Structures are given as C-alpha cells and as structure tokens.
Amino acid sequence: METFDLESHLQDAYSRFPEAKHQPIIGLTANYEGIDATLRDRYYKQVIAAGGTPVIIPPVADAQVIVNTLEHLDGLILTGGGDHNPLWMGEEPSPRLHNINQERDAAELMIARLAFNCQIPMLGICRGIQTLAIALGGKVCQDIKQLVKHSQDADRTEPTHIVEIKKDSTLYNIYNKEKIFVNSFHHQAVSEPGNHLRTIAKSSDHIIEAVESSEYKQILGVQWHPEWLEEEGLKIFQWLVNQANNFYAAKQLHKRILTLDTHCDTPMFFPQGIKFDHRDSRILVDLHKMTDGHQDATTMVAYLPQPQIGESFSSKVAFDVKGPAQYADLIFDKIEEIVSKNSQYLSIARTPADLYSDKRNGRKSIMLGIENGLALEHDISNVKHFAQRGIVYITLCHNGDNDICDSARGCNTHNGVSSFGEKVIQEMNRLGIMVDLSHGGEKSFYDALDISQTPIVCSHSSSRALCDVPRNLTDDQMRALAAKGGVAHTTLYHGFLRKEGEADIMDAIAHLEHAIDVMGIDHVGLGTDFDGDGGIRGLADSSELINFTLQLLHRKYSEQDIVKIWGGNWLRVMTQVQNFKH
C-alpha cells in the first residue's frame, strides 16, 4: 500500500460520476471449516479480472436468506470443496467416501435449485459441478475408478490431463478447441447429469469433466479448477460474467416494460385443488413462477371441451354444472377467489390501463377469456353477460365445429362462420370483446375477418409454413390478418412447432421470426398455452419466460420491438376493440 491516507484512496471514485460503472454481481459460495466461512482468493480475483463484482455467500440453509440473496445476483459460482453426503441422492455411503460438509450441502443445494428457478447464470467448479447435478436431479459417483490420475500432486497451476470437448457446446465456443489441458483435484464425479444437464466433455477414461444446460440456459459445470489456470481459466469466468451481464440487462428491461402472455389454461387444473400462491408442481403458471420469470400478466381462459355428437357437456368436465355457461362462470368465480386470497400480489385486469396500474403497484395481473364460444349456449345475451364478467376475448371455437363456426379440426358444418356466429361477432364488436380465431378453420378465419368491424386476433397460433398442421396459420392468413390490423401470437404447444422430434425454445423463436417476416413486427406476440399442453424445452413454464427475452436481446431486437412482442401489439388491438364499444 503506497499510502495510508483514506481520502487519496477514495479520490478515484469521488473524481467522477457515477462513482462506479455497473458490473454484474457474481455470488460465490463459501467453504466452511470449524467456525469459519472461507474462500480462496483465486475465485474472486478471477471474477474481478473478468469484469464482475464478487460477493461471498455464507453457507446458510435458510430459504428466506437465500431468496433475498439471489434477488441481488446476476450470476452464481458454486465453488469447490469436500464430498457431498450421499444421502442427498438416496444412497448409502461408500467405504471410499471422504469428509463431508453438512454445513454446505443443504445450503448449496437450495441455492442451486432456487437460482435455477430464477434462470440465474451459474458456473459450478469441481464440487460445484456435482452440486449442480444433485440439485437438478442427476447423480454423483462417490469414488471414481481411475485410469487417469484425477487428484494430482502437482501444483494447482499445472495442467495434468486432457479433456475432450463436444463441438456443439458452450465450452467449445469458449475455447474453440476439442481438447484442452486441465488440472485435477477430485475423487468424485458426475455419473448421470439428469434431464436438465448434458455432458459436454470427458477425460480419456470417460469421466464426465463438464456439463451444461440441456435447455438453452446459461449453466456450465467443470470438474477442474479454472481459477488456478490464469489466462486459460479466466476465459470461463469471462463467459459467466458476460452471461450475467445479459441477464442483468433482461431483468432491467422487464422492470421497464409490460410482459403479457395472451393464453394459458391453468383453470383446467382447478379440479385438482391447485394452490396459486404455492410453487405448485402440477401447474406451469403460479405466483412463484411468474415472479421467477419476471412475468407481469397472463390471460387465463375458461376452456370448454367440445362434446361430440351424442355426448353431454357435463360428462366432459369435472365440476357438476348444468351447462357450458354455468361452467365458465364457475371458472371465473374460482379465479376471483384466487385473486381475493392474494390481493396484495394479484389482480384481475380488464383493460390495458389496469395492467399498467398493477405493474406500478407491484401486482401480477390476470385477464379473463373464454376458449370456445360454446359457453354462449346459443344465446346472444350471454355475450353481454360475459362482457360484464370482464372477459377480454372469446376464442370462437375449439377442437370441433360449434354453433358459431367451423374448427380447424372440424367437419365444415357451416362452411365457415354460421349466421348465429355472425351475430356473435357483431355483438362482441359492440361490447368491446376481442374476436379470437385460434382453433378456427381457414374459411371461418376469413369470414370473421370480413364480418368484424375491429381487428381480430389469434391468441395462440403458430406458422403452417414451418409446421404443416391445420391448426396453424398460413402465410396468406397472416398477411390478411396484418392488413386488417390484427395480431397472431406464437404458441408453445410442441405439436404446432414441429412435427418430428422435440420442440424447444429455438423452434418458438423460429416461428416468431417467420411471423415477423410475413406480417411485420407490429402483429406478433406470445401466447404460451401453458397448462393446456403448451411448454417446451427452454420455455417450460412461466419461470422461464425471461429466457424468451434473452433470446430476443441476443438477436438484437430493440427495446421498442420487444415491448411490441411482449404484449404491446396485443394491447394496441385491445384498445381499438374496447374503444369501439357502443
């Protein structure tokens, strides 16, 4: 230290404004020995060298403490250390098990899972890769069979064996090499990465040396110690800091904009007694998941299954009701009960102004819709009834023709919209309710477009050019919709994104970008269909919706365009429709 004058040390900060540029906040888990929480300096020095601000996290297995800590982090490093207690994996201890650290196990497994829920970028180092695996449903071998020496006697800065890297991996993108030299200090290793991770590197004796997210999340685990490998090791820390910076940018963006999902079917699970204020594993949308994914609002629909000829409606639903209208009312009653029980955090919104008010006041919003005009029971007065209940749209039909129009999966009963359906659309226009043609047949779509005096919408519909199923929209339909000022929102139902293989977030982005190419940025958005079989790898539930934003930022969409995609276009149409009310 050159001087012991405090003022001179502060001068660098005091001589400019702001006093410091933003740097991503990177949490590092501490070791625990005796009564000391400790961390070797190489970890935090590499974070600083990579451009991050390190914060050491003590091993405290208290969910309140952990959640509050994670709220301030942009990235997380799970550091090295002793063995995990195998009981966390449901296993008895091997005779070769070394010292375990009970102070760390519960705390770090909780941190890893909760950070995963929040989509926080993570790096696991040595013990840390094993923490990731255990926390996310994988397995760790308690004592590996070594054909290569994995616990070196050489100095920690000295690489002693080779790691072979898969080319389609984050690690390859970091090093641009299929083989790198690493140090090694372990006798345990990941044996099964589980569903959320995939193996991306192995040693020559087939020990797993690195894993990454299998869901396009920013998660990387390495079995070696890059903090000791100077410039070569720094590259991994730079990767994490870069991802943390992107995550920070996405979080800040979500604070400024409104994020609206235009279609979810969570009420389908009401008969199971779901708890919206719990992180309920039975549903994809709840207060926890919306908060983790930085989602402001969703549109919950009363979905009414279309009976086949000879079937009764009551035989197709779990609640004892007289008919479709009473069923829809019951669903809305139950949504109102949920909101009433959680009124500090949740509200029903009926207009764009309500949504923005809820966001300013720190509440999540639910908008109401009807999926299948069967709810009207061939009674035009029920349009007014449901308008008074606060619905914002009616999807005219579902899977099967009804008395309003023909379905994409129908029998061409009316050759499009029926005469009753025409009256329904006109009444919806009069009462300020959006006309939704998701599930509608192609002739029904064009009829509705001609009949409606306000723009129509497709709350959850993807592109037939990319996935040729009748339920998706053709390019001509998209162009016609855009010409009338309407919007079509990409959905996350796997069968509407691809016909073969597993759909993932990249398929959803491809459908969105195709819609943008065809219709323009002013006519697109996202309608997940969560809890109605929507949900794909990378966008599996509401907690993962910030990953959608990260993909948009990665593709250099402007904030203005992201606002439009995240509901701005939809709310423009809603405003037009509601202003037409007369």
Predicted regions and their residues:
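N-terminal beta1-alpha1 cap of cysteine-dependent amidohydrolase-like domains
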Residues: 1-125, 134, 141, 145-174, ...
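Proline-centered loop/turn at the N-terminus of a beta-strand
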Residues: 24-25, 53, 121, 139, ...
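Distinct, well-ordered alpha-helical segments
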Residues: 138, 353-355, 379-383, 406, ...
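Histidine-centered catalytic micro-motifs
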Residues: 184-188, 221-226, 259-266, 440, ...
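Glycine-enriched alpha-helix->loop->beta-strand junction motifs that scaffold or abut catalytic
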Residues: 216, 294-295, 391-393, 431-433, ...
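N-terminal hydrophobic targeting/anchoring segments and the immediately downstream early-domain regions
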Residues: 249-413, 468-489, 493-526, 530-582
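Alpha-helix-loop-beta-strand connector modules within alpha/beta enzyme cores
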Residues: 414-431, 448-458
